[in-house]
Amino acid sequence: MITLKQALSLSQDELETLKNEIDAKVRASDLNAYIKAPSLNGASAKGVPILIKDNISVKGWEITCSSKILEGYVAPYHASVMENLHQNGMAGFGLSNMDEFAMGSTTESSCYGITKNPRDKNRVPGGSSGGSAAAVAGGLAVAALGSDTGGSIRQPASYCGCVGLKPTYGRVSRYGLIAYCSSFDQIGPITQNVEDASILFDAISGHDNKDSTSANLKPTQTFKNLNRDKRFKIAILRDHIKDASNEVQLAYENTLKALKEMGHEIVEKKMLDSHYQISIYYIISMAEASSNLARFDGVRYGRRAQNIKDLKELYLKSRSEGFGDEVKRRIMLGNFVLSSGYYDAYYLKAQQMRLMIKEQYNKIFEEVDLIFTPVAPTSAHLFNYHASPLEMYLSDIYTIGANLSGLPALSLPVAKDPLGLPIGMQFIAKAFDEQSLLDVSYALEQELDLKLD
């Protein structure tokens, strides 16, 4: 597939040809990365076609978050990132499959069915932005937008062999993103290479008056300033690596060796056990989800239950029929931790611990430029692999720290396991220092020159 950098130099006629080629490929594909053929919606404007995750509002398109409860909901406005794309020569073209309401790590909970990993169709693409990553890796999209709440851009990028960037919280507007967890969610790019990630990130970044959490900063110019010759002081967290598979640990050590040979300084640091981060993340995210999803009741928009006797039954039936099992589970747990008698014991303590984790990151970043970790404990696993929801939650162990602390992080493919499946590693940077993430990843990408196809 043509890269985003190359596509931006195409004429309007050439772009129309490209869109027709993508549409034909999507119709012929069995990956189920797109919800439907992109030509059925058409492009959101003239420009390079960008795949959009199904929780980002595109005016005139049915946006469902891959959930039955939003069937028939047509977005009445563009998300701010869509307006930014249009101003930078890009446009939405197609909606990607995802875990329902972004709650999952496998893209198995979508009401549209599973998405397959293009590297091995018996395996998951990761989630929740699994459709976006599968499409980019499978040659079905030039580039894509995803959202990252606890690793939902970086983990599927790692499983599929793409570059995935989670920006600093507040760097990219969330206006028009259908919320899962408002204090964690961030929109970001999934692309074929680091240059494309930089270009797409620059296009969507910047202050937005319609988002009260948006940082008052101008759009970034990371692509213009990409520098592969910069050298960084990089921290590693040895105690956290023990949970990774042997293949991931080997890829980690080999990448560390490459970073040292490139001239980067590597230092060891310590942090709170990452298993605590899992508990903190899920308590807070489920609490916020139970509040955010209370708006879907069958009254104002989306699916409405039939043959009901009163308002209470309308609420009960609409939500019971509309939400999938994983979403129901998280709503119930969220309501539990917010209930009287448990609020102080769970939610309040989790918020206090979140602040402590953020302070630990800040302390490390007083002495280093970047932190280097795996993205996931394993490469992509088979469908129905997890015996329990808790096992699935543990797959986020390396990614949630950046969300808890609001820091930027980037997933870069660095190796293949014995089955030929991609393995990604992650850099985390100081708040609003996406430039360093992209610089070090750009240099490492060229140094490793990994061939996945």
Curated annotation (Swiss-Prot):
Keywords: ATP-binding, Ligase, Nucleotide-binding, Protein biosynthesis
Active-site annotation: K53, S128, S152
InterPro entries: Amidase, Amidase_CS, Amidase_dom, AS_sf, GatA
Its EC number(s): 6.3.5.7
Cross-referenced SUPFAM superfamilies: Amidase signature (AS) enzymes
MF terms (GO), sorted A to Z: ATP binding; glutaminyl-tRNA synthase (glutamine-hydrolyzing) activity
UniProt GO cellular component terms: glutamyl-tRNA(Gln) amidotransferase complex
Keyword check for Ligase: yes
A Gene Ontology BP annotation from the UniProt entry: translation
Pfam family, one: Amidase
Family recorded in the similarity comment: Belongs to the amidase family. GatA subfamily.
Designated name of the protein: Glutamyl-tRNA(Gln) amidotransferase subunit A
Lineage: Bacteria, Pseudomonadati, Campylobacterota, Epsilonproteobacteria, Campylobacterales
